[in-house]
């Protein structure tokens, strides 16, 4: 078992990790991947041993976040150890951590030699980051930012699917953080979010979101028309 139900705690018990990997790979007929961190504590990083053992167990690919459990999301991701892992094992390695722009994506791929990248927090409220990165890696050029109308339609579509999946009560509440991510840095967004948090039904929530974006559209359809602050894409609070 894991203290506090945190899987990263398993990194303190390499024998248990090995037994779990062996058991899962043996139990299923589909490829098994592993996502983990550099280790549990700074200064005691054991990812090289864990990665090698994962390969021996038959893990199909390794996704590696460039921090320890101790780091949480503090400090910066350490790509050097991801590079060392890539040099050590022969299964695909997926680099993860602090990738928040097309330029950063290219840097991480080039520096680590990773086979792919994984994006987490930077995609919150910005799902188009994937097409931006793919376009940049292919052409070396930047895509234009989505306009306000597109952001509105993407968000409303996201909410519709979220409501359908989670239902009325949970859907309304889970959606709040997503709406906050999409609207962070936009004009009057603080006031909008405070009002949005008070809404208790999915229908009303979608309505206030649509109304807010319609107000923004009255000022212009470009993101630059309505952005009022620099947004840290990795700030989830």
Describe the function of each predicted region.
Residues 1-17, 67-78, 141:
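Glycine-rich tight-turn/loop motif centered on a GG-T
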Residues 2-4, 24-33, 38:
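N-terminal small/glycine-rich loop or linker at the start of catalytic domains
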Residues 9, 38-40, 70, 93-94:
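A generic structural signal for short
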Residues 11, 15, 31-49:
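Active-site glycine- and acidic-residue-rich loops that bind
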Residues 19-22, 27-29, 43-61, 73, ...:
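Alpha/beta catalytic cores of nucleotide-metabolism and tRNA/nucleoside-modifying enzymes
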Residues 34-38, 66, 95-97, 121:
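A cross-domain feature marking catalytic cores of carbohydrate-active enzymes
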């Amino acid at each position: 078992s894991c203290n506090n139900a945190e899987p990263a705690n398993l990194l303190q018990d390499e024998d248990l990790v090995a037994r779990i990997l062996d058991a899962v790979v043996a139990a299923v007929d589909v490829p098994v991947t592993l996502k983990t961190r550099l280790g549990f504590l700074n200064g005691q990083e054991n990812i090289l041993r864990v990665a090698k053992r994962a390969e021996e167990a038959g893990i199909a690919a390794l996704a590696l976040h460039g921090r320890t459990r101790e780091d949480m999301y503090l400090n910066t991701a350490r790509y050097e150890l991801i590079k060392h892992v890539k040099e050590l094992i022969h299964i695909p390695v997926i680099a993860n951590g602090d990738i928040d722009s097309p330029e950063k994506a290219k840097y991480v791929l080039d520096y680590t030699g990773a086979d792919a990248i994984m994006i987490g927090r930077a995609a919150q409220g910005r799902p188009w980051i994937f097409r931006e990165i793919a376009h940049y890696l292919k052409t070396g050029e930047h895509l234009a930012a989505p306009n306000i109308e597109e952001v509105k339609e993407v968000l409303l579509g996201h909410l519709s699917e979220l409501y359908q999946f989670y239902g009325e009560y949970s859907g309304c509440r889970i959606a709040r953080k997503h709406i906050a991510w999409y609207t962070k840095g936009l004009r009057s967004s603080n006031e909008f979010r405070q009002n949005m948090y008070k809404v208790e039904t999915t229908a009303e929530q979608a309505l206030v979101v649509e109304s807010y974006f319609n107000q923004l559209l009255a000022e212009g359809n470009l993101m630059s028309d309505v952005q009022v602050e620099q947004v840290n894409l990795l700030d989830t609070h």
